[in-house]
């Protein structure tokens, strides 16, 4: 399978879980595409089954906060089209699941069906 994984790239629990899951899936022969704003800390190598796609977050002087959700959705759409993803697995509801929902709707309007799995993390 070609799997997109969206996670926070930090050393925190969800980032560790998502990265280790992706590495294990790649070891089993799946193609895994990490989509996030920085290369995950525990993703210390890339190979023929492991890819990293950086979310480019534009800045606008009129916005107090950068539009990360829009940029993330856009990158998910791009990777799904480019890599032919079979599945998106997002970790965390906000902003990842909401961005995945938007990306799924954009892809559906183009006749592309990509199922989304959300893993909720929290303390």
Question: What are the residue ranges of the model-derived segments?
Answer:
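Short helix-capping segments at alpha-helix termini
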Residues: 106-113
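Glycine-rich, highly charged phosphate/nucleotide-binding loops
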Residues: 66-75
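Short N-terminal targeting/anchoring amphipathic segment
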Residues: 76-96
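Extreme N-terminal starter segment of soluble prokaryotic enzymes
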Residues: 1-4
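N-terminal strand-loop element at the rim of the active site
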Residues: 7-11, 23-67
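A conserved mid-protein helix/loop that constitutes part of the nucleotide-sugar donor-binding site
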Residues: 16, 20
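A short, histidine- and acid-enriched strand-loop-helix "catalytic/donor-clamping" loop
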Residues: 114-123
């Amino acid at each position: 399978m070609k799997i997109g994984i969206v996670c926070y790239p930090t050393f925190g629990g969800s980032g560790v879980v998502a990265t280790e899951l992706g590495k294990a899936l790649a070891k089993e022969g799946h193609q895994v595409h990490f989509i996030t704003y920085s290369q995950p800390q525990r993703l210390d190598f890339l190979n023929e089954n492991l890819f990293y796609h950086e979310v480019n977050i534009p800045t606008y002087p009129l916005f107090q906060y950068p539009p990360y959700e829009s940029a993330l959705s856009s990158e998910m759409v791009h990777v799904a089209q480019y890599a032919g993803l079979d599945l998106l697995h997002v970790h965390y509801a906000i902003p990842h699941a909401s961005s995945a929902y938007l990306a799924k709707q954009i892809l559906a309007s183009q006749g592309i069906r990509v199922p989304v799995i959300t893993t909720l993390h929290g303390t």
